[in-house]
Design a protein with these regions (language model features):
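C-terminal alpha-helical interaction appendages
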Residues: 1-72
Length: 72
């Protein structure tokens, strides 16, 4: 699998897990993460984030999004 496909797969997985954790739809999850820079964060920090547990990644996303004005 190419690096690009791995990054896409990881991002999709994170969006899905974030949706489940917060009891929102995957579309709402993506829109929220996009608006509050979570998607950008995953792209920029993939090299580190993909080595962490999904729980840790979700915590990182929650912290980042709150710092950028999110409230989930």
């Amino acid at each position: 699998m190419s690096e690009k496909k791995r990054k896409i797969s990881f991002t999709i997985s994170c969006v899905s897990d974030f949706a489940k954790k917060n009891r929102i739809s995957e579309k709402e999850s993506f829109c929220y993460l996009f608006q509050y820079k979570g998607i950008e964060f995953l792209k920029e920090h993939y090299d580190v984030e993909h080595t962490l547990s999904h729980d840790t990644v979700l915590e990182d996303l929650e912290i980042l999004c709150r710092r950028n004005g999110g409230n989930i």
